């Protein structure tokens, strides 16, 4: 029996399963392999029918299903995206999934079909099912079978006014292939140069402005751009807000009273939602010498967010909170996330808690899940706790040092032993932190400090997450596992090949263990190659995701793992809480049905998590680009992190910013690319630009709109044969003389 890949989305998972199967499968076999039950079978049946109609699946003997192997040829059916209108008013489309090396072909949808109702109100960006008919050179003709999208795709654009009064909407992302749109003087009369808008383009209605977002020279616009570009839900319905404001602290009732335990929260200085609290004390059992009793208490969000209500639907749609440098797009309204579900000090709060008994080596001897009422003793920060354990106490940490903080560190050291024994993958990716000046401009960008206090909380959370997964397994209740597959053999082979060309040794194992990746990282940690090797290892790994089917967590070296500790900001944790409530009979507001399928939920929240990560990275990069605008013309120390035929990718040492040096900006010679050795070599001077090398670079352009930094190589003024690099005019530089700090909304 073939093991199906764990679902990231059902469509992709079905195709991967059938592609990996040695023989055709029936619909029932597919359902069993993917764990599809109940109403989910209806969705699976419809999906299989859609995939067959799209030409991606074939049915053979006894209606057994296989992946179709069809070339791009007349008579075949494909999914395409409409990208424009031709000179004769015909629609122009391109294949949606083009994986061939040849140029992407354009497809004309025949003008004779314009009267077809299937053409009415078709929007540029819409997906359609097309039957290919004929072609000349790289132009095909095709017939629309059906429309696959009901609504026009919304694009994000920056407005530029032309001399004749008309305007142009251009893409705000360098990877966006959409050609943009032209606006007449009448359509653009209210718009200003540099204004960001969301818009749709329809064949029948033309260009329609959906939302005026702000100007590119205003940093408040950066987060808004990501919100609209990635379609992040950011407002709550009146019903959801009303429900959040009706909530009250529950009576003790059947809950466990934990208010006498000195639990504390430990978070960043700028945190406003505190969803986890911790406590530890030495285990008094003489049979467990050196052991610990620890408690992890988590906000009881499930008490306020009931299955199917408006709050639940809003949280599910979002999947998770999204964190930008200047604001948070919360999963729940602030009345919950910053108030009733925030474990503020000295006030009663409903909680779900897991008590664990640890051995001196950090192994969990036993665990017990409770639904309780707690009262946090203090709101501490990572910096405070770290300074306290190092001997620098303040008025808050001084009375807690012996009774609370030192026991926490004692238990942490035990948990750390267990982590080391498991051989957890240790990838440290430095986070950047934007520091704003008093007048609101971006003062500097620094690596975010990382202390043992951060690791302490991480280890306590991991222990609680494991205990939650074990509990649901033991009780036979559904669980949304947090899974991480072992690296794909092809990715490992590519990593090994890259390292071999750089003469860096690595394990010859087909499936390396986390400890073998750690050896590679340790060997290069204090070298200029460190960040590049970390990135290579990270890219070789599978992506962690959610699934009701457990395959374990490779990176953490755990056989069972779930997310339990952040229900304020992750819907997965809320589902785990509900399942625990039902499994342990802790209330009537749990998951309810033991046979419920979590496949579609896993699919959805895995997707929202990926979208959030992309949006967060995009906004951070835009802030970093904006910071560099006043520094155009200055020199920086950089590391070469990528070598291509057309130039070098570099990372700035001080800010972590990444940019590009076009090959034409490499002065004094012409350079050719040695692909296997990852370097550019000068034909005359034999100057070498090698992957991982340090060099001084000069910032040539910082483009906030395209979110890109262009560099040249810095040279002394008396360098012979110096070819000057022309400093590119940058309108963003003029617009960004001072960057104001948007008001925080965390």
Language model region names:
Residues 1-295, 302-347, 379, 384-387, ...:
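Charge-lined substrate channels and their catalytic hotspots, especially those that engage the 3′ end
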Residues 1-8, 74, 670-680, 713-746:
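Acidic, low-complexity intrinsically disordered tails
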Residues 86, 95, 171, 359, ...:
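Acidic/polar residues at beta-strand termini and the immediately following turn/coil
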Residues 92-97, 168-173, 649-654, 660-664, ...:
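Short, acidic/hydrophobic/Gly-rich beta-strand patch recurrent on exposed beta strands
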Residues 101-110, 176-183, 656-674, 724-725:
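A short macromolecule-binding patch
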Residues 189, 201, 215, 225-232, ...:
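Electropositive polyanion-binding surfaces
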């Amino acid at each position: 029996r073939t093991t199906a890949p764990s679902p990231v989305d059902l469509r992709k998972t079905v195709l991967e399963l059938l592609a990996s199967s040695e023989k055709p499968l029936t619909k029932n076999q597919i359902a069993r392999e993917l764990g599809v039950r109940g109403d989910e079978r209806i969705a699976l049946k419809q999906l299989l029918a859609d995939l067959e109609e799209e030409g991606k699946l074939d049915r053979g003997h006894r209606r057994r299903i296989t992946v179709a192997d069809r070339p791009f040829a007349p008579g075949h059916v494909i999914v395409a995206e409409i990208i424009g209108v031709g000179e004769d008013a015909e629609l122009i489309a391109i294949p949606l999934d083009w994986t061939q090396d040849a140029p992407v072909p354009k497809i004309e949808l025949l003008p004779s079909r314009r009267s077809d109702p299937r053409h009415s109100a078709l929007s540029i960006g819409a997906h359609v099912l097309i039957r290919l008919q004929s072609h000349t050179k790289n132009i095909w003709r095709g017939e629309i079978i059906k429309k696959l999208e009901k609504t026009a795709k919304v694009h994000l654009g920056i407005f530029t006014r032309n001399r004749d009064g008309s305007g142009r909407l251009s893409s705000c992302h360098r990877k966006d292939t959409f050609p943009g749109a032209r606006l007449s003087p009448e359509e653009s009369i209210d718009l200003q140069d540099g204004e960001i808008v969301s818009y749709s383009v329809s064949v029948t209605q033309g260009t329609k402005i959906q939302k005026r977002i702000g100007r590119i020279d205003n940093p408040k616009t950066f987060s808004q751009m990501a919100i609209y570009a990635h379609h992040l839900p950011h407002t709550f319905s009146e019903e959801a807000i009303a429900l959040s404001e009706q909530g009250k602290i529950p009576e003790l009732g059947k809950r466990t009273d934990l208010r006498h335990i000195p639990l504390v929260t430990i978070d960043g200085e700028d945190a406003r939602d505190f969803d986890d609290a911790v406590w530890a004390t030495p285990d008094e059992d003489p049979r467990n010498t050196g052991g610990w009793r620890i408690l992890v208490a988590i906000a009881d969000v499930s008490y306020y967010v009931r299955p199917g209500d408006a709050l639940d639907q809003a949280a599910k749609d979002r999947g998770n909170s999204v964190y930008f440098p200047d604001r948070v797009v919360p999963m729940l309204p602030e009345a919950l996330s910053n108030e009733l579900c925030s474990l503020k000090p000295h006030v009663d709060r409903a909680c779900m808690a897991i008590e664990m008994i640890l051995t001196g080596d950090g192994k969990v001897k036993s665990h017990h899940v409770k639904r309780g009422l707690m009262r946090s003793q203090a709101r501490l920060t990572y910096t405070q706790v770290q300074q306290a354990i190092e001997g620098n106490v303040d008025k808050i940490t001084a009375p807690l040092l012996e009774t609370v903080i030192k026991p926490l560190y004692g238990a942490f050291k035990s948990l750390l032993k267990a982590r080391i024994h498991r051989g957890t993958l240790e990838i440290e990716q430095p986070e950047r932190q934007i520091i704003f000046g008093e007048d609101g401009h971006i003062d500097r960008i620094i690596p975010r400090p990382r202390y043992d206090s951060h690791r302490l909380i991480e280890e306590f959370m991991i222990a609680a997450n494991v205990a939650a997964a074990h509990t649901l397994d033991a009780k036979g209740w559904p669980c949304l596992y947090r899974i991480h597959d072992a690296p794909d053999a092809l990715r490992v082979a590519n990593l090994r090949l890259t390292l071999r060309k750089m003469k860096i040794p690595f394990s010859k194992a087909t499936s390396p263990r986390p400890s073998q990746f750690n050896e590679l990282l340790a060997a290069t940690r204090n070298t200029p190659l460190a960040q590049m090797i970390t990135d290579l290892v990270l890219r070789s790994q599978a992506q962690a995701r959610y699934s009701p089917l457990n395959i374990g967590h490779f990176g953490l070296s755990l056989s069972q793992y779930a997310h339990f500790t952040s229900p304020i900001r992750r819907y997965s944790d809320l589902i785990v809480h509900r399942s625990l409530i039902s499994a342990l009979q802790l209330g009537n507001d749990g998951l309810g049905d033991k046979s419920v399928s979590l496949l579609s939920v896993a699919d959805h929240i895995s997707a929202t998590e990926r979208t959030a990560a992309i949006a967060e990275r995009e906004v951070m990069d835009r802030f970093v680009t904006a910071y560099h605008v006043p520094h155009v013309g200055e020199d920086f120390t950089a590391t070469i992190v990528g070598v291509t035929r057309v130039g070098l990718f570099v990372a700035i040492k001080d800010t972590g910013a990444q940019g590009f040096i076009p090959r034409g900006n490499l002065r004094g010679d012409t350079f050719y690319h040695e692909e296997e050795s990852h370097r550019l070599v000068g034909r005359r001077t034999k100057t070498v630009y090698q992957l991982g090398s340090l060099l001084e670079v000069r910032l040539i352009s910082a483009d906030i709109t395209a979110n890109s930094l262009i560099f040249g190589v810095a040279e002394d003024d008396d360098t012979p044969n110096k070819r000057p690099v022309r400093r590119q005019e940058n309108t963003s530089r003029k617009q960004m003389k001072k960057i104001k700090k948007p008001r925080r909304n965390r």
